[in-house]
Amino acid sequence: MLIPSKLSRPVRLDHTVVRERLLAKLSGANNFRLALVTSPAGYGKTTLVSQWAAGKNELGWYSLDEGDNQQERFASYLIAAIQQATGGHCSTSEAMAQKRQYASLTSLFAQLFIELAQWHRPLYLVIDDYHLITNPVIHDAMRFFLRHQPENFTLVVLSRNLPQLGIANLRVRDQLLEIGSQQLAFNHQEAKQFFDRRLSSPIEAAESSRMCDDVAGWATALQLIALSARQNHTSAHHSARRLAGINASHLSDYLVDEVLDNVDVSTRHFLLKSAILRSMNDALIVRVTGEENGQMRLEEIERQGLFLQRMDDTGEWFSYHPLFGSFLRQRCQWELAAELPEIHRAAAESWMEQGFPSEAIHHALAAGDAQMLRDILLNHAWGLFNHSELALLEESLKALPWESLLENPRLVLLQAWLMQSQHRYSEVNTLLARAEQEIKGVMDGTLHAEFNALRAQVAINDGNPEEAERLAKLALDELPLAWFYSRIVATSVHGEVLHCKGDLSQSLSLMQQTEQMARHHDVWHYALWSLIQQSEIQFAQGFLQAAWETQERAFQLIKEQHLEQLPMHEFLVRIRAQLLWAWARLDEAEASARSGIAVLSTFQPQQQLQCLTLLVQCSLARGDLDNARSQLNRLENLLGNGRYHCDWISNADKVRVIYWQLTGDKKSAANWLRHTPKPAFANNHFLQGQWRNIARAQILLGEFEPAEIVLEELNENARSLRLMSDLNCNLLLLNQLYWQSGRKNDAQRVLLDALQLANRTGFISHFVIEGEAMAQQLRQLIQLNTLPEMEQHRAQRILREINQHHRHKFAHFDEGFVERLLNHPDVPELIRTSPLTQREWQVLGLIYSGYSNEQIAGELAVAATTIKTHIRNLYQKLGVAHRQDAVQHAQQLLKMMGYGV
């Protein structure tokens, strides 16, 4: 819940001096990216900018405090301020900020700018007290903000010092409007206006100018002069002499003498007690100070000129001038030290009553009241956890004694979930084990089950599926239905374990249950995770169309719940890329993989390994070996600088081994085979994949017998577990083994099986990647004219893809090849005496590649009748009568030229 006063522009008071010369300068702020107002405390930065902002509707105001160094809090308020300025235009960014569903501040800002691209009027955002920001991550994000904000957007920053926002660069590019302390200092005319409005008796212009010079135009000093003159009934000039040459560091003594010591005891205590509040309203004042009418007291303090300012148009929220507030808090620690804990307790209670638990925690921590802090956490910690207030929770839990956590074990559970969210898996188990050992009495069964659900999640994350399954089952046996979050966790883990074990049907059922529970209770990250798992299972089962449709539901969920910047979004676009690659939609697959890399742009490069693997796959399917090699260099560098799940390693090894196959690099394959551990099982898709990599390397090295043993066992496992996509891949690799070892009949048999299974999977690129050996076999099958219609259509599609992407592999008789052929000593005499034209050579190459007449016409962009003429001419020149004769003739020419076909 956001505090309204932090998003309210200060109210312009009637007795303030209108700074016309500075307002004129600010009037051109819309021509700059950044308007920067800097000066020490008390020079009137906020007052000036609030005057300038008056009447501007499309302006957001964000007043900072120390707590805004938390990235999530900063993001929430900043987006809320822009929403106020735009009337709710940036709803997606607002939802992402509220739900903490973004990868980083920069990625959230990138989404914000996408929405602001449709906003065409001038827009302003004021950030007050930016000097309070010390978090370098926020500084980096705001530099990004300034670089990429729309042209019609102006950021206005108020700060006591020069902020770390790339100021020099903006200044050089004339994108910075600056107002500093010298310009903010009152001139003689402004000082005269100020005293005329504040003092009951006017003073001469010369005296006013002299006092202005004495304090170097410092607005706070002028205000103190007027206040002191009114309180002490002395001349303003007397106060000015005391303030001459004073600065903020020596102001405390003056404020004690001239302000605190000149108010009655009741007002003094009111000032000191209320100063602990960063912002205040009637209810807070009543509780903290004991005054009966807090609103009336606040307005009275404001009228006395005691540095209290309204924070909103309604007059409900107030705050002290930062300089005076800081002074009062320091004095409160000295003068009311014994009462201070009780004052903070009262503040915490009032904030709780108004629904601001994070502010209440701030005061409970300041009070050192562990019992109050514990009670707040017991009632509100999980809500704060779900809103990613992780830093505040961690600080709070550290402030509680261990004994208090043991007495309230759900707080131990919360601390463990905090550790899990930070991937501190070993610490989670250590903490839970210690708690179980030291909790007095019999531990509640439900709590024990919640511990086990968390342990199960840690175990599966840490690559221990057996332990994860045991713990998940224990948790589900004991958890009541009402404990929905832990049940969602345990059900999800159990489903993931069954997926790893190859029990796809049961795993799919559990993931569907997880989705239903997660949607019902608005646990959106588990709903998304379950959909991703369902899609992977359906892919493994060979139901790629069903996997596609499940992915569509996941994309819709991401859109509806604004989950675009969760790392899981990368998982989804990656498995979409895998599916698109299988269907030979290579451009879309590549775009999807690149979007996955973009999602992870703020994470460690190692996280991008899977998407990079897919980019290599796309290059290999296109036959672009140079590009594949470049991408592989980066991939292999990442492999050497990280620890990865076996699934990631299997996918990375796959593209490496295929590349070695396509380039004939037996040395690299042999070295990899020597050092690669062989998995103990092959009961899921990633273990099947790694065994397939091993078999492919063995085939490349001519080790046909061990490769055949591997593939036959893989097929047996795949059939028993219904891993139909893996079976399709295994059959294709077995086909290559039979083809290269001269067992043509066996090769044809398994190829027919693979084509039939592809009617279910839709595979195209898995065939294409095998290149010319696959093309030759498909040509022969097409020529036999015995394939069923669907298999015939798929075979022709695969041939077109091979011809398009692997044309350098003999499918095209280009000019260089023809020239070498005609100069060959064994070229048939008929071709010498009646040579083919270049177009006729092209047609012969396409016939050899399995193209029909219509497809050849489309490829060469000529009429079908023209193709028939070319075919008739080349048949006559070659002395053949049928298409199959022409294919055989082309094959003989290729063999003569030394190509192994």
UniProtKB/Swiss-Prot annotation:
Residues 829-894 form the HTH luxR-type domain. InterPro entries: P-loop_NTPase, Sig_transdc_resp-reg_C-effctor, TPR-like_helical_dom_sf, TPR_MalT, Tscrpt_reg_HTH_MalT, Tscrpt_reg_LuxR_C, WH-like_DNA-bd_sf. The keyword Ribosomal protein does not apply. Pfam families: GerE, TPR_MalT. The keyword ATP-binding applies. Residues 853-872 bind DNA. GO terms for biological process: positive regulation of carbohydrate metabolic process; positive regulation of DNA-templated transcription. Disulfide bonds: none annotated. ATP binds at S39, P40, A41, G42, Y43, G44, K45, T46. Keywords: Activator, ATP-binding, Carbohydrate metabolism, DNA-binding, Nucleotide-binding, Transcription, Transcription regulation. GO terms for molecular function: ATP binding; DNA binding; DNA-binding transcription factor activity. Activated by ATP and maltotriose, which are both required for DNA binding. Monomer in solution. Oligomerizes to an active state in the presence of the positive effectors ATP and maltotriose. Belongs to the MalT family. Positively regulates the transcription of the maltose regulon whose gene products are responsible for uptake and catabolism of malto-oligosaccharides. Specifically binds to the promoter region of its target genes, recognizing a short DNA motif called the MalT box. This is HTH-type transcriptional regulator MalT. It comes from Salmonella typhimurium (strain LT2 / SGSC1412 / ATCC 700720). The gene is malT.
